């Protein structure tokens, strides 16, 4: 029996390094950043949720359910993940940021295979050098653990998953897969990469 997998795209942050611009809606080569992300993951999952804490109406125009953090105060990616885990009945939830337009087109199958091979609770992607703490495939049943962690004042995703049986899946074969946009300069470089 195949596993049902939903996804959440995290677009709930403050984007301080982008001058406060909503990163998911910043245009890259004529399309909103989040549209590139959607195009990459849509064939790999059943449902997509968009986690946004502002500009919800604009995000809804992409045709997917928009959810805002249950925990108020822009508490970071964990808050968005907790909210999404409470909104899905899938076996696994894929978590990705809104500003990674070159995500692997084989992200889900490889991460799922890694989980099953190790009988792990979650998989975290790596670029071959660094783990990508907001590119995860996890079981929604981990929600209570994550909620308790956040409510204890913790914010770091990697500190949370270190407490669980996790596996790292390397995408070193796709070196630009997790290049993201935090500054206008990075956006310019990425635009050139996409047009190659």
From Swiss-Prot:
Its cofactor is Mg(2+). One of its GO terms (cellular component) is cytoplasm. GTP binds at residues 10-12, 23, 51, 69, 99. Its EC number is 2.7.7.77. It holds the Pfam family NTP_transf_3. Its main location: cytoplasm. It is found in: Cytoplasm. GO terms for biological process: bis(molybdopterin guanine dinucleotide)molybdenum biosynthetic process. Mg(2+) binds at residue 99. Keywords: Cytoplasm, GTP-binding, Magnesium, Metal-binding, Molybdenum cofactor biosynthesis, Nucleotide-binding, Transferase. It comes from the Bacteria. It catalyses: Mo-molybdopterin + GTP + H(+) = Mo-molybdopterin guanine dinucleotide + diphosphate. One of its GO terms (molecular function) is metal ion binding. InterPro entries: MobA-like_NTP_Trfase, Molybde_CF_guanTrfase, Nucleotide-diphossugar_trans. The keyword Transferase applies. NCBIfam families: molyb_mobA. The N-terminal domain determines nucleotide recognition and specific binding, while the C-terminal domain determines the specific binding to the target protein. Monomer. Belongs to the MobA family. Transfers a GMP moiety from GTP to Mo-molybdopterin (Mo-MPT) cofactor (Moco or molybdenum cofactor) to form Mo-molybdopterin guanine dinucleotide (Mo-MGD) cofactor. This is Molybdenum cofactor guanylyltransferase. It comes from Shewanella baltica (strain OS185). The lineage of its organism: Bacteria, Pseudomonadati, Pseudomonadota, Gammaproteobacteria, Alteromonadales. The gene is mobA.
